[in-house]
């Protein structure tokens, strides 16, 4: 099985891009190795890795930047690029660097476990004789919404929202779809659209110009994976009532009255009774971090 990596990243003198690949076997054991990529223009970095271990069942990877041999920058990596293994396929990855997204707060446990619990089960995607896979993140989707694909040819609805090709959720806020490349005409122009998860009814187009597939074709026994920039739709801003309080101001009959952490439980109960949903605490510092006069000014 061959893995071909390709990513756009403009480097400076002394910098290079490397990919860290983690292989997972049937027993869940992992092995990680980092491979240097090559470039001709300091902009497009490419590399190839050959996997010969037949026990491997899946793999994931991320990119890092090295400067004079030392790693100094790594991708955000909160959502790993994870794929199941098909030893009959050659994988071609066309990636974009993953910076911390503007909507990174939607990936925190406050949202994924409390405000908007994420309970959707991820689904596996089918492979074809020649496979085109498109992936995009869409954390701004509302409950009851899903993502679909529309394009400039019959296989993708010819821009008719009534024939949008529905995508599957394959990770946290990550939506993917696989197409048989034999049914796709290149060049391919497309957009992602929001649909109703139950009825499939059209909801909204993403903004901006049409996306254009950065490849000219897919050969037999190849899986071309296109990891697109995030969905271009402005989501509704989540709002809630809350209270701000420093821990040292908390007082209760069951504590010493000097801001015990145990008083936070009572504070949470009071917040719930008042109908509020958020508690913001002022920073709590270890006041012995510097061991000098600065420790008396934690802010």
Show the residue positions of the predicted features:
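Short, Lys/Arg-rich amphipathic segments at extreme N-termini
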Residues: 2-13, 20-22, 134-137, 243-252
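Aromatic-rich carbohydrate-binding modules that target alpha-glucans
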Residues: 10-56, 66-86, 140-186, 195-218, ...
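Catalytic "initiation/cleavage/transfer" segments centered on a nucleophilic residue
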Residues: 89
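Non-catalytic accessory regions flanking glycosidase/transglycosidase catalytic cores in CAZymes
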Residues: 126-127, 192, 270
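Extended acidic/polar, glycine-enriched regions
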Residues: 202, 207-236, 262-266, 278, ...
């Amino acid at each position: 099985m061959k893995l071909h990596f390709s990513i756009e990243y403009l480097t400076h003198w002394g910098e290079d891009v490397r990919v860290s690949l983690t292989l997972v076997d049937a027993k869940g054991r992992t092995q990680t190795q980092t491979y240097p990529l090559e470039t001709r223009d300091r902009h497009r970095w490419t590399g190839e890795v050959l996997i010969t271990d037949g026990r491997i069942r899946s793999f994931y990877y991320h990119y890092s930047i090295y400067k004079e041999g030392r790693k100094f920058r790594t991708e955000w990596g909160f959502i790993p690029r994870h794929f199941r293994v098909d030893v009959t396929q050659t994988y071609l990855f066309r990636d974009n660097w993953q910076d911390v997204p503007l909507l990174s707060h939607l990936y925190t446990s406050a949202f994924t476990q409390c405000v908007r619990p994420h309970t959707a089960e991820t689904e596996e995607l089918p492979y074809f004789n020649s496979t085109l896979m498109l992936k995009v993140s869409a954390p701004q989707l509302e409950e009851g919404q899903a993502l679909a694909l529309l394009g400039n040819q019959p296989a993708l609805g010819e821009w008719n929202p009534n024939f949008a090709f529905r995508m599957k959720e394959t990770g946290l806020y990550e939506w993917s779809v696989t197409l048989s490349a034999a049914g796709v005409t290149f060049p391919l122009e497309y957009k992602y659209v929001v649909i109703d998860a139950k009825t499939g009814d059209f909801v909204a187009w993403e903004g901006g110009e049409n996306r254009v597939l950065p490849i000219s074709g897919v050969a037999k026994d190849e899986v071309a994976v296109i990891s697109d920039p995030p969905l271009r739709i402005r989501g509704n801003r989540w709002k809630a009532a809350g209270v701000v309080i420093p821990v040292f101001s908390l007082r209760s009959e069951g504590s010493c009255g000097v801001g015990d952490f145990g008083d936070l439980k009572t504070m949470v109960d009071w917040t719930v009774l008042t109908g509020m949903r958020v508690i913001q605490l002022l920073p709590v510092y270890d006041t012995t971090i510097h061991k000098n006069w600065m420790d008396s000014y934690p802010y």
